[in-house]
């Protein structure tokens, strides 16, 4: 893939960016009553309004040129064809195959992966429905009331986000919990109030060697065995893994092991066996609807022209702000409490994918890549960090997401929520001029020095860019579309930046060093051999933990 800075479209965008400095968004809107019509797209019941961005028709044309010159279409097609686009690990990237219901073969190393996918989905359907119906019972014959998913990273963030997002579809009386942190507090607090007789554990680890996951799994096993005895493990544990030997040694019946493959990256794995807690929570039909929604977005991504392609547009806008307008962060702001874990999920999906400084050909990048992503559900964020977005010195593009129809239509709650959703995008776009602030203060009775002292604090610069994503309602299909939209956005940006979105070498170094430090914490006779700071902290840990 080419160095993007050598492309003519990149140079044209760099020359174009300064021309927008005297065209703030409020001016662009006032000059063009059809701006919304020109800069929004609808796909089924999902609408992307990108009109409140610092763009003109020329900007979007240049960004489309950049996409074509960067090979966005070719790399997209290579992914769907099963080519090993994860070059540092020599792997295909085929999470999209997991949600493809068509009979068209998908080949990896010459073999069609569709039959294996279908077999695992059938296994998931049978198991999840058995748990939900009460046909699956624990060692004492009681039905399962609580499912505890033990995983970390992609084995946790995706499933917990979806289970929370689809709580309106959950089976009453069947609770799904998630344990990820190796801090013993997490599993200790989760197990409080649970009954071993009615609890099922799902251990999610592809290799069945992940330190955090296996530490928590063994603690859960000890808790269960202490109450029900060793033979109970087989009725109260299932594994989402490929390591049959380790799963069996743990005491799990390999008939209750759900496989996935090395062409499924962790942060893209909720569509695989890792999604079993989703299927148990909301039912397999709703899990299938989630897959179908994602597949619909996959088809749109493959077939829509660049100028009308939702993931491409979102991705290019991110490149525009990061590389040409100096933005180093992005906010994702869902105005739906069910989406309260969306930002955390997208943090991993985006930052672990595109937090890279090395190109596909091993060179250090000379441009900005992935941004810091954060967010909170509205209106909580409004009373937290929106101050900085409105009046701070950093440019932070925002994605606002909301459903038009609430699952909980209580009084005026949803109308108030959506009025804030709409007001924030307008306020960030328009701002408040000094003249407007002066008139407002004067109308409140202020004058003279008091007015002049307060005036600068009441000015909002505006021109803060936002996308608004409005869906009809948050249901499994729509959620699948939304997640796939962001997955493909990430892919588009990685293509433009000429980086690998599908490895994560940055997580390795700390884990390697932790293995060396662990025995030094557990055995005071070992002399630590690190830098003075690390050695000093180890000494303090020994002092404090000794009592």
From Swiss-Prot:
Keywords attached to this entry: Cytoplasm, Gluconeogenesis, Glycolysis, Isomerase
Gene designation: pgi
Catalytic activity entry: alpha-D-glucose 6-phosphate = beta-D-fructose 6-phosphate
InterPro entries (UniProt xref): G6P_Isomerase, G6P_Isomerase_C, Phosphoglucose_isomerase_CS, SIS_dom_sf, SIS_PGI_1, SIS_PGI_2
Subcellular localization(s) per the UniProt record: Cytoplasm
Family under the similarity heading: Belongs to the GPI family.
EC number, UniProt record: 5.3.1.9
Pathway(s) served: Carbohydrate biosynthesis; gluconeogenesis; Carbohydrate degradation; glycolysis; D-glyceraldehyde 3-phosphate and glycerone phosphate from D-glucose: step 2/4
Keyword Cytoplasm on entry: yes
Subcellular location, principal: cytoplasm
BP terms from Gene Ontology: gluconeogenesis; glucose 6-phosphate metabolic process; glycolytic process
Alphabetized HAMAP family for the sequence: G6P_isomerase
SUPFAM superfamilies: SIS domain
Function: Catalyzes the reversible isomerization of glucose-6-phosphate to fructose-6-phosphate.
NCBIfam families, sorted: PRK00179.1 (NF001211)
UniProt-recorded Gene Ontology molecular function terms: carbohydrate derivative binding; glucose-6-phosphate isomerase activity; monosaccharide binding
GO CC terms, sorted: cytosol
UniProt-annotated catalytic positions: 352 (proton donor), 383, 511
Pfam families associated with the record: PGI
Protein name as catalogued: Glucose-6-phosphate isomerase
């Amino acid at each position: 893939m080419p160095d993007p800075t050598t492309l003519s479209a990149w140079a044209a965008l760099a020359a174009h960016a300064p021309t927008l400095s005297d065209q703030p968004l409020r001016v662009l809107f006032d000059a063009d009553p059809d701006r919304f019509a020109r800069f929004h797209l609808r796909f089924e019941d999902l609408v992307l309004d990108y009109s409140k961005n610092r763009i003109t028709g020329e900007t979007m044309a240049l960004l489309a040129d950049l996409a074509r010159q960067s090979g966005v279409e070719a790399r997209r097609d290579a992914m769907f064809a099963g080519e090993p686009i994860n070059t540092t690990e020599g792997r295909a990237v085929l999470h999209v195959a997991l949600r493809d219901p068509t009979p068209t073969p998908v080949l990896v190393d010459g073999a069609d992966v569709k039959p294996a996918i279908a077999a695992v989905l059938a296994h998931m359907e049978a198991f999840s429905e058995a748990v939900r119906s009460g046909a699956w019972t624990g060692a004492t014959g009681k039905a399962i009331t609580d499912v505890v998913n033990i995983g970390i990273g992609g084995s946790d963030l995706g499933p917990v986000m979806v289970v929370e997002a689809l709580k309106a579809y959950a089976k009453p009386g069947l609770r799904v919990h998630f344990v990820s942190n190796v801090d013993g507090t997490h599993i200790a607090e989760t197990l409080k109030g649970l009954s071993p007789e009615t609890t099922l554990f799902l251990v999610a680890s592809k290799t069945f060697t992940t330190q955090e996951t296996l530490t928590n799994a063994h603690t859960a096993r000890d808790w269960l065995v202490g109450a029900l005895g060793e033979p109970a493990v087989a009725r109260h544990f299932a594994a989402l893994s490929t390591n049959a030997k380790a799963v069996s040694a743990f005491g799990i019946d390999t008939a209750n092991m759900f496989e996935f493959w090395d062409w499924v990256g962790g942060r893209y794995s909720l569509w695989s066996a890792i999604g079993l807690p989703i299927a148990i929570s909301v039912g397999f039909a709703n899990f299938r609807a989630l897959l179908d929604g994602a597949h619909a977005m996959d088809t749109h991504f493959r077939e829509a022209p660049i100028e009308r392609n939702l993931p491409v547009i979102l991705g290019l806008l991110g490149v525009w702000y990061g590389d040409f307008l100096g933005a180093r962060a992005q906010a994702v702001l869902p105005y739906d409490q069910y989406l309260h874990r969306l930002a955390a999920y997208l943090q991993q999906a985006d930052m672990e994918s595109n937090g890279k400084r090395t190109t596909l050909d091993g060179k250090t990048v000379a441009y900005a890549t992935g941004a810091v992503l954060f967010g909170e559900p509205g209106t909580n964020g409004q009373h937290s960090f929106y101050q900085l977005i409105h009046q701070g010195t950093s440019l932070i593009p925002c994605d606002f997401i909301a459903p038009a129809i609430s699952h909980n239509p209580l009084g005026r709650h949803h109308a108030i929520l959506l009025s804030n959703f709409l007001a924030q995008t307008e306020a960030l776009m328009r701002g408040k001029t000094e003249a407007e602030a002066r008139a407002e203060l004067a109308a409140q009775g202020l004058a003279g020095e008091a007015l002049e002292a307060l005036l600068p604090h009441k000015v909002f610069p505006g021109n803060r860019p936002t996308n608004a994503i409005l869906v009809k309602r948050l249901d499994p299909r729509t959620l699948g579309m939304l997640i796939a939209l962001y997955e493909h956005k990430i892919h588009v940006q990685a293509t433009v930046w000429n980086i690998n979105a599908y490895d994560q070498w940055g997580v390795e170094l700390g884990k390697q060093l932790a293995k060396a430090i662990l025995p030094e914490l557990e055995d005071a006779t070992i002399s630590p051999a690190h830098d003075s700071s690390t050695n000093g902290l180890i000494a303090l840990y020994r002092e404090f933990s000794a009592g």
